[in-house]
Amino acid sequence: MFYDDNADLSIIQRRKVGVIGYGSQGYAHSLSLRDSGVQVRVGLPEGSKSRPKAFEQGLDVDTPAEVAKWADVIMLLVPDTAQADVFENDIEPNLQPGDALFFGHGLNIHFELVKPSGDVTVAMVAPKGPGYLVRRQFVDGKGVPCLIAVNQDPTGTGEALALSYAKAIGGTRAGVIKTTFKDETETDLFGEQAVLCGGTEELVKAGFDVMVEAGYPPEMAYFEVLHELKLIVDLMYEGGIARMNYSVSDTAEFGGYLSGPRVIDADTKERMRGILRDIQDGSFVKKLVANVEGGNKQLEVLRKENAEHPIEVTGKKLRDLMSWVDRQSTETA
C-alpha cells in the first residue's frame, strides 16, 4: 500500500496532463489535478455537451487531438467502447516518445484493443469510487483508494508517475494498491457481470416474479426484493457481511443462513466460473466489440426487454410516492 509519503507530487506537476473525456471520472480528475498545481487541459469534441460545464469550472478545453498534441501525459477517460476510436484518430497521431498514456480501467490495453508504441509509458490510475465521491473527498482533504498499474515502462519511471498522479487526485491520502492491467480488468468485469449488475439484477427480478406468480401484490414484492435492498447493501458497505447480519433481526439472519445457500449453491458457483472463463479468454470482449460494430443493436434490444419487465412498471408507480428519491438520477425513461 502506498500513501502520501510514498509519492512525489512534483513529478506530475512538471508534466502537462490532458484528460480526454469529462464524465464522472473526467471532471473529478481534471479539477483535482488543477487544484494540485498540475497543468491540465480537457479534450472534448467541438459539439460535446460537456464543453460548457468544463469552461464554467475554469478549465482549458480543446479538441481531443489538440489536447493530445499539447500534453505529455494523456488520461483517457471516455467510455471503454469509444477508446479505440479516440486513440486511433486523436491520440496515436500525436504521441511522442517519452509521453505517457494513462487509463482509468484496463480493458482496452489488456485485450489489445488499444496498442500504443513501445516508447510510450502505459499506466493506470483507477479510483475505487465514482467521480463525485473522488472530487468530494479531495475537496474535504481526504481521498478515495486507488489502484495503479504499469503495463509499459520504457523509461523506468512509470510507477513513480502513476503514484504522483494518484496523489494529485487524493488517492494517496486514502491508500494506493499496486495491481496489473490483467487483474484489474478481469476482476472488474467479473464483479459487474456475476454480482453487482447482472447477478443482482436477475436475483431481484426472479424474486419479484416468484412472489407475484404466487399471488402476492406486485407492490409488496417490489418493496421486499428491490426497495429494501439498499438498506442491506448500505450495512454491508459500512461494515461487511457481519455488520449486516448483526443489524438485521434474528429472524432475518437465521432465515438467510438457511435459505441463502439454496439460492446460491455449488451449481451457481460453477456457472460463475464459466462467466470468469469467458472474461479471461476474451469471449466477452469479442461480443462487446461485435455489439459496438453492429451499432449497439444487441444492447438496445436487451435494454428494451429489461425496461419492459413488470418490476419496472411497478417501481415507477411506487417511486412517484417517494418524495425523497432523486427521480432525475433514477428514472431512465
Curated annotation (Swiss-Prot):
A cellular component term, taken from the record's GO annotations: cytosol
A Pfam family recorded for this sequence: KARI_N
SUPFAM superfamilies, per the entry: 6-phosphogluconate dehydrogenase C-terminal domain-like, NAD(P)-binding Rossmann-fold domains
Entry annotation: catalytic residues: H105
GO biological process: isoleucine biosynthetic process; L-valine biosynthetic process
Family: Belongs to the ketol-acid reductoisomerase family.
Protein's name in the database: Ketol-acid reductoisomerase (NADP(+))
Organism: Mycobacterium leprae (strain TN)
Lineage of the organism: Bacteria, Bacillati, Actinomycetota, Actinomycetes, Mycobacteriales
